[in-house]
Amino acid sequence: MKVIDQFKNKKVLVLGLAKSGESAARLLDKLGAIVTVNDGKPFEDNPAAQCLLEEGIKVITGGHPLELLDEEFALMVKNPGIPYSNPMIEKALAKGIPVLTEVELAYLISEAPIIGITGSNGKTTTTTMIGEVLTAAGQHGLLSGNIGYPASQVAQIATDKNTLVMELSSFQLMGVQEFHPEIAVITNLMPTHIDYHGLFEEYVAAKWNIQNKMTAADFLVLNFNQDLVKDLASKTEATVVPFSTLEKVDGAYLEDGQLYFRGEVVMAANEIGVPGSHNVENALATIAVAKLRGVDNQTIKETLSAFGGVKHRLQFVDDIKGVKFYNDSKSTNILATQKALSGFDNSKVVLIAGGLDRGNEFDELVPDITGLKKMVILGQSAERVKRAADKAGVAYVEATDIADATRKAYELATQGDVVLLSPANASWDMYANFEVRGDLFIDTVAELKE
């Protein structure tokens, strides 16, 4: 870890705990800052706040009192999940207090080169693929960021012999100023998190922050399958390296079933260890990064062939009497579910879908669900999903929760079929996050097998 003194004796407010806030508070304390932590959860129900207080860090819990900002803070570090419309953040900005997220802190202290991955879908799988390929090549990829390991925590243990592979959400990228990866990847961009950003343009702008400090010496890996992303290529100072399954590009591409990098075959598409056209795109992005980092083709091929996927991302769970169960709980939007379905024969799929109602209609999903064996629909968005099923001519049943949905899907399936949890919706109407939803699916499958 680089020792920096820019926070020494500075008063810093950490707004919101969870993993990233807790990590940021400890790091800032270590760097000599005078840290105050403010979290909305009551102290008695807040083990993170209790631990920080025991470590000598000031904590204020149970709400976000605006008068707290009457103190002269030099900086606010906010939890990524707290929107900029929060009154505390609005007041801080009005007072001229800089507002950052902890990935900025991670960048400032990291001795390791940074590869940043963002996008609407495919971030976690691509991040994991890149980390595994680099580690296999002796470059010791350390995963961090939105993938579940706070960037500021991992950066403290990273050395110049590691590579910091960061999954970055739009929430995190809104709060960067000096953040400067050597390689950045944008997997795709589609309307999501509009409830947080307000406008799709604001969401895209947040994602685009990943390249703000990049120069021609850095590489920006872009998905040329998508016109929106392709059009961004002319708006960066970085050297653009494209990937595509639709055209031959000066980067990584698919042609006649083979994955190429700049004219050289790396591996066959059907050798990738996980199914689906979206995973071909993820593999191409990984190949581009790996080749830019000097990894040989054999290492790339062996690693991607052995890749078993990521939990909750089209994860194979089990086979019960010839019925295969896949957990794709991370599919919280339409595009993700479209990608998941592309890897299967619809006539053999029982799809579990539905969740938080964000006001979306699901007409875009109609061509992709046409021909499904059956659907099991649940959640706040059930009526909207049912309308799409009716348009597609797909029979469905309703379920009360994930356990009920899993049991009903199994009853509808026969030998050779697939039960696919790919909700096309966020989980927050019923569950704290997609991980909880996916774990309940996995647990129910285990019960069915008993």
Swiss-Prot record:
Q: Which Gene3D superfamilies match?
A: Mur ligase, C-terminal domain (3.90.190.20), Mur-like, catalytic domain (3.40.1190.10), NAD(P)-binding Rossmann-like Domain (3.40.50.720)
| A Pfam family recorded for this sequence | Mur_ligase_C
Binding of ATP: at which residues? G119, S120, N121, G122, K123, T124, T125
Q: What is its main location?
A: cytoplasm
Q: What is its EC number?
A: 6.3.2.9
Q: Where in the cell is it found?
A: Cytoplasm
Keywords, comma-separated and alphabetical: ATP-binding, Cell cycle, Cell division, Cell shape, Cell wall biogenesis/degradation, Cytoplasm, Ligase, Nucleotide-binding, Peptidoglycan synthesis
Pathway info:
Cell wall biogenesis; peptidoglycan biosynthesis
Q: What class of enzyme is it?
A: ligase
Gene Ontology BP terms: cell division; cell wall organization; peptidoglycan biosynthetic process; regulation of cell shape
GO terms (molecular function) for this protein are: ATP binding; UDP-N-acetylmuramoylalanine-D-glutamate ligase activity
Going by the entry's taxonomy, the superkingdom of the source organism is recorded as Bacteria
What InterPro entries does its record include?
Mur-like_cat_sf (IPR036565), Mur_ligase_C (IPR004101), Mur_ligase_C_dom_sf (IPR036615), Mur_ligase_cen (IPR013221), MurD (IPR005762)
Stated family = Belongs to the MurCDEF family.
Can you name this protein? UDP-N-acetylmuramoylalanine--D-glutamate ligase
Q: What is the lineage of its organism?
A: Bacteria, Bacillati, Bacillota, Bacilli, Lactobacillales
